[in-house]
């Protein structure tokens, strides 16, 4: 485990953020832009395809106007995020839910109601990530997959302190620990893009529900 994570829990202040203001205020402006480059976006889509994400019902956590799936999921897509305008612009979404997971980590869905839960380049903003991922485990069907993708890009004032304080390898360790503490076993992590100067790296972490 990386030094950013202690053996008996998270270091004091790990989940503090520079901007302690209401997240709802921060996300009021609709940002109809992508936050990673084209190669990183392609890597997200390829990973989803490899894991069969589009072959069932999908929940996209902390979503926006694009979900980076190569096609519309056969079982439908629920996009949950902070900005209604962004979510309603998502062409793949069958249902949108506006919810701040930092205020309420409980997902408004029945047990075992999704085949995949994904979260793209947003895990670093959660102040209760383990609780949210336990909820992801609850709503996943047996054999369903949770997929977290992340890069080195973020809104630094809203990312948690522990994330900003470590390097990319440390962030991989953090995400693995989030998943393991949420009860997922057999977690896989990988760098999904080639290391190239000036390009965004894309890391993935995924696991199947029991």
What are these model-derived regions, one by one?
Residues 39, 43-107:
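Class I SAM-dependent methyltransferase SAM/SAH-binding core
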Residues 115-130:
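A short SAM/SAH-binding and catalytic strip from SAM-dependent methyltransferases
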């Amino acid at each position: 485990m990386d030094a950013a994570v202690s053996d008996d829990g998270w270091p004091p202040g790990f989940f503090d953020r520079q901007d302690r203001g209401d997240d709802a205020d921060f996300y009021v402006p609709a940002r109809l832009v992508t936050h990673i480059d084209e190669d990183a976006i392609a890597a997200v889509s390829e990973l989803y395809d490899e894991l069969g994400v589009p072959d069932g019902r999908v929940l996209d956590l902390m979503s926006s106007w694009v979900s980076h799936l190569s096609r519309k999921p056969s079982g439908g897509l629920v996009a949950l995020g902070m900005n209604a305008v962004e979510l309603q612009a998502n062409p793949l979404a069958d249902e949108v839910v506006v919810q701040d997971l930092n205020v309420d980590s409980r997902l408004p869905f029945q047990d075992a109601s999704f085949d995949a839960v994904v979260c793209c380049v947003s895990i670093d903003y959660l102040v209760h990530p383990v609780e949210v991922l336990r909820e992801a485990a609850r709503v996943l069907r047996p054999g369903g997959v949770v997929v977290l993708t992340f890069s080195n890009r973020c809104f630094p004032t809203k990312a948690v302190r522990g994330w900003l304080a470590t390097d990319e390898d440390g962030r991989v360790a953090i995400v693995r620990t989030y998943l393991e503490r949420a009860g997922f076993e057999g977690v896989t992590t990988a760098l999904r893009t080639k290391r190239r100067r000036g390009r965004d790296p894309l890391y993935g972490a995924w696991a199947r529900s029991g």
